[in-house]
């Protein structure tokens, strides 16, 4: 059946619909574009001079509607204009009002304090010591007339001698008493001089003088049927359970504020997910209606200077196990492959400017570094110490900090190394030497006068600029086997490999490349130090063959690399010709270790996975371990096909129904028996009366 577009309707009705649609669009835009501000976490710290402190406060909250962290109003002088605070509607953290001398703080549109962060670990609202030392000036009014909800945390009001009407506020209607929050209410001593609530205020609850400051109660007046807030006393006035601070109607789109997330004009438990399970392709597809969570709001795009996490949240910085990257124009937090990058200054840069060598004083600054901006120079003075600068000798164990380094932007110069070390083990993960600065303007790699037997730089793949010098290392072998040209980025780069151990002596002592290494050389002994492999490679080791038909773990071969099969692939041992997998991932298995879901091997069939139209996808495994869709009426999974496969419901409702039914039957039977006995009694009584009457008629008269 066709549906006529409201925009094509004619006459007044069509015009009215058009106006309503336009208003709806405008409303959604307004909701979506609420201005947010970061907030502060300074507590009672004053930011410079009092004038600068106020300017910072004004700049932060001007036109702000949603505060992402804490709202801290402190050190405001008398006669300051704070009208810029009127726009604030929501605070995610706590509200701190302290050490102010101003008469009025007009937070008149503040509706909700979420309390995600609490002041002093206890309070979502703290109003403290707002007065001048002479007590002639101080905070007198705090008209938060729309504040209806504090989701977490208590209230502390203390030492405000001029502040009125805090005692006339029904705080139990605002705070979540079920959490038993700490509440400290120390009201002013001169309450008798404070203005009374307007006569129209409910039970004399107000934020100040006048009817406009009456407190609107949204919880204690609610009917028992209400699960949260309400707008009146009857059951039909209950708010939706996603509402916070009250509502104008029963729907989730009628909330004054949202308990968890706001999606356009609707309150929801979660934002629309970014991906959904596709039962046709058996994969997770991008949800065109998906949104990111930004504070308590669902947004199409994260704001400027925010990055996106895997969970679909907008954050200011990535976690320590992720790094920031741009993909398709979106800044994302991507899982690090191993240790996350940490960039450190090298010799000659920043705090190490003017330093000649790595030493016991500065080596700890390279801990967990993956990239060094600058140079790395290890000179003999490092292990000798320096009496003049009172620098102790370097502990050789400290050199392990360089195991995380993958890139050096300058040069690597090593003129001293532990005598018992056979190679440059600390730099085994170094991949690139950029050579943007060079030793003596020429060398980007220099290894001189060491006792090592091999270089051991097995991860080095590129020397971008500069020459190399491997000199005067009397025990060093392998260096002249390398095809250094394959590491260079320019044709002008040169090598200087002289005065190391004689090649014939190296061969005689079997200090030669492993047979599994290719002819382009090696960094040291064994299959782990090959520059490239003759046959296949498994991670950093050269091997003769991959574990395709036997061995653990089972593998497949690609580009001369042995790569592991997915863990959901069933290992094949039945014949000598069966491979376990043909490629990466769970969709290239020859057989599945557990179950099959479409083309994929899975550990378990989908159970309650979110699919299209917010429906949950449930599947069961058939006799062939293939995942099949449950019957649509099986809303909690199934064990087989059809309705018969649905799990039996909980026995508790059945027992309850049986008990109620049994009691009802007893009542009915009891009533039936009672009625029967009563009727029988009435019949007997009537019979007896009739017999008596008949006896009177036939009885002879006595003379």
Curated annotation (Swiss-Prot):
Secretion signal span: 1-30
Sites bearing Phosphothreonine, chain numbering: 687, 702
GO biological process: cellular response to epidermal growth factor stimulus; epidermal growth factor receptor signaling pathway; learning or memory
Cytoplasmic side: 668-703
Compartments, record wording: Cell membrane; Endoplasmic reticulum membrane; Golgi apparatus membrane; Nucleus membrane
Alphabetized CDD domains for the sequence: FU, TM_ErbB1
Membrane topology note: Single-pass type I membrane protein
Pfam families reported in the protein's UniProt record: Furin-like, GF_recep_IV, Recep_L_domain, TM_ErbB1
List of glycosylated residues: 134, 190, 200, 359, 368, 420, 573, 578, 613, 633, 648
Known role: Receptor tyrosine kinase binding ligands of the EGF family and activating several signaling cascades to convert extracellular cues into appropriate cellular responses. Known ligands include EGF and TGFA/TGF-alpha. Ligand binding triggers receptor homo- and/or heterodimerization and autophosphorylation on key cytoplasmic residues. The phosphorylated receptor recruits adapter proteins like GRB2 which in turn activates complex downstream signaling cascades. Activates at least 4 major downstream signaling cascades including the RAS-RAF-MEK-ERK, PI3 kinase-AKT, PLCgamma-PKC and STATs modules.
Subunit structure, interactors included: Binding of the ligand triggers homo- and/or heterodimerization of the receptor triggering its autophosphorylation.
Protein name per UniProt: Epidermal growth factor receptor
């Amino acid at each position: 059946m066709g549906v006529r577009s409201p925009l094509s309707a004619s006459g007044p009705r069509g015009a009215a619909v058009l106006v309503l649609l336009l208003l709806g669009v405008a409303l959604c835009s307004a909701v979506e574009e609420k201005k947010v501000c970061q907030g502060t976490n300074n507590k009672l710290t004053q930011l410079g001079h009092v004038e600068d402190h106020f300017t910072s406060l004004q700049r932060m909250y001007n036109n702000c509607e949603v505060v992402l962290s804490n709202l801290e109003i402190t050190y405001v002088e008398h006669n300051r204009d704070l009208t810029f605070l009127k726009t604030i509607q929501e605070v995610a953290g706590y509200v701190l009002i302290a050490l102010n001398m101003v008469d009025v703080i007009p937070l008149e549109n503040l509706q909700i304090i979420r309390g995600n962060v609490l002041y002093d670990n206890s309070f979502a609202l703290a109003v403290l010591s707002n007065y001048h030392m002479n007590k002639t000036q101080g905070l007198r009014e705090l008209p938060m007339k729309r504040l209806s909800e504090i989701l977490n945390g208590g209230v502390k009001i203390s030492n405000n001698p001029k502040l009125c009407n805090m005692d006339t506020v029904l705080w139990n209607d605002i705070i979540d008493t079920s959490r038993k929050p700490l509440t400290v209410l120390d009201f002013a001593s001169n309450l008798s001089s404070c203005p009374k609530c307007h006569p129209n205020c409910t039970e004399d609850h107000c934020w100040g003088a006048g009817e406009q400051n009456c407190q609107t109660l949204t919880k204690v007046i609610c009917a028992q049927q209400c699960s949260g807030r309400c707008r009146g006393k009857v059951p039909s006035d209950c708010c939706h359970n996603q509402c916070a601070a009250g509502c104008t109607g029963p729907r989730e789109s009628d909330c004054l504020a949202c308990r968890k997330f706001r999606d356009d004009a609707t309150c929801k438990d979660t934002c629309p997910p970014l991906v959904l399970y596709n039962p046709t392709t058996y994969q997770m597809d991008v949800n065109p209606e998906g949104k990111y969570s930004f504070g308590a709001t669902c947004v199409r795009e994260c704001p400027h200077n925010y990055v996106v996490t895997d969970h679909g949240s907008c954050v200011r910085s990535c976690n320590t196990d992720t790094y920031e990257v741009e993909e398709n124009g979106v800044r994302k937090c991507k899982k690090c492959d191993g240790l996350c990058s940490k960039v450190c200054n090298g010799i000659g840069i920043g705090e190490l400017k003017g330093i000649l060598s790595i030493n016991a004083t500065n080596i700890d600054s390279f801990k967990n570094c993956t990239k060094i901006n600058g140079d790395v120079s290890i000179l003999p003075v490092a292990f000798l110490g320096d009496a003049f600068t009172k620098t102790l000798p370097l502990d050789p164990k400290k050199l392990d900090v360089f195991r995380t380094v993958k890139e050096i932007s300058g040069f690597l110069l090593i003129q001293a190394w532990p005598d018992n070390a056979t190679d440059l083990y600390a730099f085994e993960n170094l991949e690139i030497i950029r050579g943007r600065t060079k030793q003596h303007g020429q060398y980007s790699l220099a290894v001189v006068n060491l006792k090592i037997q091999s270089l051991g730089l097995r991860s080095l793949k590129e020397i971008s600029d500069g020459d190399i010098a491997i000199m005067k290392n009397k025990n060093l072998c392998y260096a002249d086997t390398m095809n250094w040209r394959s590491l260079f980025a320019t044709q002008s780069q040169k090598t200087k490999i002289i005065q190391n151990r004689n090649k014939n002596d190296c061969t005689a002592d079997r200090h030669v490349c492993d047979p599994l290494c290719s002819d382009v050389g090696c960094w040291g002994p064994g299959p782990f130090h090959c520059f490239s492999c003759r046959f296949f490679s498994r991670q950093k080791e050269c091997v003769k063959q991959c574990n395709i038909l036997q061995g653990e773990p089972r593998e497949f071969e690609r580009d001369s690399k042995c790569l592991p099969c997915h863990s959901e692939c069933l290992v094949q041992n039945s014949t000598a010709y069966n491979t376990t997998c043909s490629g990466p991932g769970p969709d290239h298995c020859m057989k599945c270790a557990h179950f099959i879901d479409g083309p994929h091997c899975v550990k378990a069939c989908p159970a309650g996975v979110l699919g299209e139209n917010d429906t949950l996808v449930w599947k069961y495994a058939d006799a062939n371990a293939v995942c099949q869709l449950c019957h649509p009426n099986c809303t909690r999974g199934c064990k087989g096909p059809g309705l018969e496969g649905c799990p039996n419901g909980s026995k508790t409702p059945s027992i309850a129904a049986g008990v109620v039914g049994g009691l009802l039957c007893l009542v009915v039977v009891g009533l039936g028996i009672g009625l029967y006995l009563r009727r029988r009694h009435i019949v007997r009584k009537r019979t007896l009366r009739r017999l008596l009457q008949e006896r009177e008629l036939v009885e002879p008269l006595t003379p």
